[in-house]
Amino acid sequence: MSSPAVARTSPGGSREMAPAPQGRGRFWEVGGGSGHRLERAAAESERWELLLRRGELLALGGHLKGALEAFAAALRRGAPARPECLGALVDCLVFNYRLRHGLGWSAAPVAGADGGAGGLLRCLGCRGFLSEPVTVPCGHSYCRRCLRRELRARCRLCRDRLPPATASATDAEGTAPRPPPLAAAIAASDFRTSVVLNHLAEKWFPGQRERARAAGRLGELLHQGRYREALAAACEALRAEPSDLIVKIYRAESYAGLQEFKAAIEDLNAVLFQLPDWPEVYFRKGKVLCDAGFLGDALQLFLQCLALDEDFAPAKLQVQKILCDLLLPENLKEGLKESSWSSLPCTKNRPFDFHSVMEESQSLNEPSPKQSEEIPEVTSEPVKGSLNRAQSAQSINSTEMPAREDCLKRVSSEPVLSVQEKGVLLKRKLSLLEQDVIVNEDGRNKLKKQGETPNEVCMFSLAYGDIPEELIDVSDFECSLCMRLFFEPVTTPCGHSFCKNCLERCLDHAPYCPLCKESLKEYLADRRYCVTQLLEELIVKYLPDELSERKKIYDEETAELSHLTKNVPIFVCTMAYPTVPCPLHVFEPRYRLMIRRSIQTGTKQFGMCVSDTQNSFADYGCMLQIRNVHFLPDGRSVVDTVGGKRFRVLKRGMKDGYCTADIEYLEDVKVENEDEIKNLRELHDLVYSQACSWFQNLRDRFRSQILQHFGSMPEREENLQAAPNGPAWCWWLLAVLPVDPRYQLSVLSMKSLKERLTKIQHILTYFSRDQSK
């Protein structure tokens, strides 16, 4: 390497080049090269970041081909291979997968739509028996197994976020997403089972409950990697109950753990033959194929799983990993493997590859913008490192189920789908024509028009049987606080159930469970109190008469609380005036209850009175209208109210710790004589001018505080007697004047506008003299 030259000036003034010192030359050379490389690296980094962003935007817009090209180009330019960055691409790929097969978006199922207790006591996640039920914050119930395995990211019915079992999941930015506090609290409590629902499941279906326990022990063996023991236990359980599909899935996992992929696929195919709409089975089958090295076939199964359930988190993660691996430059040229799976007699279709997907996506969507770099053509050569397996795909999938071929000629399916899996696509297409496919006992598909009721329908769970009448006991549905039938039952993170109103009243006093004393601070801060849907549905189905009587009592209590003249709730605190804002900080349990009842009944009103040494509160007060309530995490609240009608107390009372009263409303006596009206107008204008002068002469600090708390002074009104309480500025002025509350109370009780103006004039005259001094 030659040394760089250094310019120097000769004695004659001319410039000539001289070699630089060898050591310093090396320093300059390395420094200059490093700076150039840093600039080039920064430019490349900026370029691949733009490509990643471009790919994400194209994926969000539904342009699959352009998105794939952009992500592949970004990886070629040095972008880090992070699967979590491909969430939008996976969503776009699933969307195109649906379009290619005419699959409609699956509607949210209606809980209990299949009827019978077996349908009600069914997990919304795995569709199996609701063993160890856990009620999530949205009010729906899942079995503990589903929540611990994190099979779903969102609730299947309402799409609310489910509690994460671990904090290992990452979002698109690579950081762990923070779950809602209540969901995190449920996960931290190790998913406590719902005490009431668990008791009912054990009481009504002891056999199913015992089988679920055995399946739970199988899951623990698999989690510990003891596949031989799990396989032996699963085979023994299936000999006793051959129709237990959950155990059959566990046996398939045991086979997969022992590298016996053919046996695992056989079990999973048998499950799919009976339940063709079960996303988890497609995922398990995809995992088996992925472990066997057939990434292309596994990818299709993961996509089919997401097509049935877009919130199936493990499948989405697997697709992200596969896409990230396939888009790497060293793998992209080799493409997905066209396995012998696709050449099976029952699935003669073209193989799944990105090239065909991109071509079809162009016909389904608008053409994407041209990229500066082209993606290399995808070939049918195997993926590097994915074929080093002893078993072939055909030997793995050699098992076929009978009596399905005739129904599948009407629909085009993916090559990776076995015969029984094709029924899913047929079922989805028929559902668009308002028809359903049902599976009868003989295993044949038949069409059922909506409204018909078959004798026996194989849904997503086994028929658990009807409940004997002697097992239905109303005491199983009683709230432990009010000792009455559950009304709007809610379940806490610790698993206990109460009436919604009963629990709220307990939390007014302390943020702890009334039974186990576990902290419910997160539950209180969340303030959702979602009704436990399953518990309410069971009550509606099996205790309709008792529920009707309970609802009648509730309606009577609500009607009693809705009166605005009898038993009106009274907040004993300060003076309130018509049209004047009155913000309140509510922290006492009795007033928390009072405010909540005012909102729930719909009146959103209560009375405000000052305290009285003799009668607990004054004889006159003002109604307050709730405009907004801001709840604090510990249960306190800041209530924004404004004054309404004035009233006089007729009778005092007490209810649940707070004061009540029978009241009559006050209105100003109107003046009819024209001379009196003229005199009243002159007095009004004089006092208004005097009030404006007094307010303007206040110190800036006092004036700004008044404006901040009460707002600006209302304008004078043309019709003095239009409002039943007179001009609004009078009440605003009375609220800001620093006078004794007893004097203010006397003005509040006056029914004559003239007398009220005279009183205010006396006060202003007194304070104006002080200002002049």
From Swiss-Prot:
The keyword Zinc applies. Residues 558-768 form the Lon N-terminal domain. GO terms for molecular function: zinc ion binding. InterPro entries: Lon_prtase_N, Lon_prtase_N_sf, PUA-like_sf, TPR-like_helical_dom_sf, TPR_rpt, Znf_C3HC4_RING-type, Znf_RING, Znf_RING/FYVE/PHD. Residues 359-370 have a biased composition (Polar residues). This is LON peptidase N-terminal domain and RING finger protein 1. The lineage of its organism: Eukaryota, Metazoa, Chordata, Craniata, Vertebrata. Residues 1-29, 359-388 are annotated as: Disordered. The gene is LONRF1. TPR repeats lie at residues 48-81, 212-244, 246-278, 279-312. The keyword Metal-binding applies. A zinc finger (RING-type) spans 123-159, 479-517. Keywords: Metal-binding, Phosphoprotein, Repeat, TPR repeat, Zinc, Zinc-finger. GO terms for cellular component: cytosol. It comes from Homo sapiens. The modification Phosphoserine is found at residue 431.
